[in-house]
């Protein structure tokens, strides 16, 4: 249920008001975006989440709640509470592995997601690319970065192949291997976009795994694999710029050195793929 409040609650206020019988169990700090914590009462568990980006508008957090509210429970956690700066969702029991599942299994999950009703808001990358440029450390802004940004602005985003609801942050740490199948967590970047954009954004281990994932998806979607791969490749410069810009943005926000290393690595990939 959504709950409106002008003043954000503290963690203790949240628990005492809405979950008085629950107690915190553990904190999750995995991933690049931040942490959440687990609460429990008599075997029932919920995950309590906060916005990963403290500077993002509250509307972005609300969109995540709305996305989870309309997704089937077989692929995503069901939300139970939304209010300013807090969201409470089901805990998904299962294993989070350090590597991606079989490409055919992952393709099946993504294809099923892409058959769901659209969320109602579009993913547009150019505003994000420009935001990350503006909000990055001025000392890190380069002529090459600006040149690539102008090039993409002039080229415009690739034409859509198929418009579907997307997760947009598919990597091993966001996949729960449950008894009933694969499920996705961390839906903060979800929105409607090109299916090829989703496939391009998957954090794969190598090009062979990426090609196999696209081929397996193409079989399910009844698309020529070569056609789908070409569309995926069209999104590569956009995705690499998005990742590099996000890492730069997070570096300025947090001062965490891991973001500088990741940004530098992504810039190198971008040069290779140009």
From Swiss-Prot:
It comes from the Bacteria. It catalyses: thiamine + ATP = thiamine phosphate + ADP + H(+). Keywords: ATP-binding, Kinase, Nucleotide-binding, Transferase. Its EC number is 2.7.1.89. It is an enzyme of class 2 (transferase). InterPro entries: Aminoglycoside_PTrfase, Kinase-like_dom_sf, Thiamine_kinase. The keyword Repressor does not apply. GO terms for molecular function: ATP binding; thiamine kinase activity. Pathway: Cofactor biosynthesis; thiamine diphosphate biosynthesis; thiamine phosphate from thiamine: step 1/1. GO terms for biological process: thiamine diphosphate biosynthetic process; thiamine metabolic process. Catalyzes the ATP-dependent phosphorylation of thiamine to thiamine phosphate. Is involved in thiamine salvage. HAMAP family: Thiamine_kinase. Belongs to the thiamine kinase family. This is Thiamine kinase. It comes from Escherichia coli O1:K1 / APEC.
């Amino acid at each position: 249920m959504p709950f409106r409040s002008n003043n954000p609650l503290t963690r203790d206020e949240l628990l005492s008001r809405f979950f008085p019988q629950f107690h915190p169990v553990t904190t999750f700090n995995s991933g690049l975006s931040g942490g959440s914590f687990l609460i429990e009462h008599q075997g029932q568990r919920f995950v309590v989440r906060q916005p990963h980006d403290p500077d993002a508008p509250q509307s972005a957090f609300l969109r995540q709640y709305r996305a989870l509210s309309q997704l089937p429970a077989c692929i995503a956690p069901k939300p139970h509470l939304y209010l300013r700066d807090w969201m409470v969702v089901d805990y998904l029991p299962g294993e989070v592995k350090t590597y991606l599942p079989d490409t055919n299994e992952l393709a099946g999950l993504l294809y099923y997601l892409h058959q769901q009703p659209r969320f109602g808001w579009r993913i547009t990358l150019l505003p994000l690319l420009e935001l990350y440029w503006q909000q990055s450390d001025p000392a890190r802004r380069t002529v090459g970065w600006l040149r690539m940004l102008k090039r993409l602005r002039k080229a415009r985003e690739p034409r859509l192949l198929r418009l579907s609801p997307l997760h947009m942050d598919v990597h091993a740490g966001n996949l729960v291997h449950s008894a009933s199948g694969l499920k996705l967590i961390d839906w903060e970047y979800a929105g409607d976009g090109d299916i090829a954009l989703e496939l391009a954004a998957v954090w794969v281990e190598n090009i062979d795994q990426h090609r196999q994932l696209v081929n397996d998806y193409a079989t399910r979607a009844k698309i020529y694999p070569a056609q789908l791969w070409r569309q995926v490749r069209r999104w590569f410069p956009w995705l690499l710029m998005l990742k590099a810009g996000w890492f730069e943005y997070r570096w300025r926000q947090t001062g965490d050195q891991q973001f500088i290393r990741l940004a530098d690595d992504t810039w190198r990939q971008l040069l290779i793929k140009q």
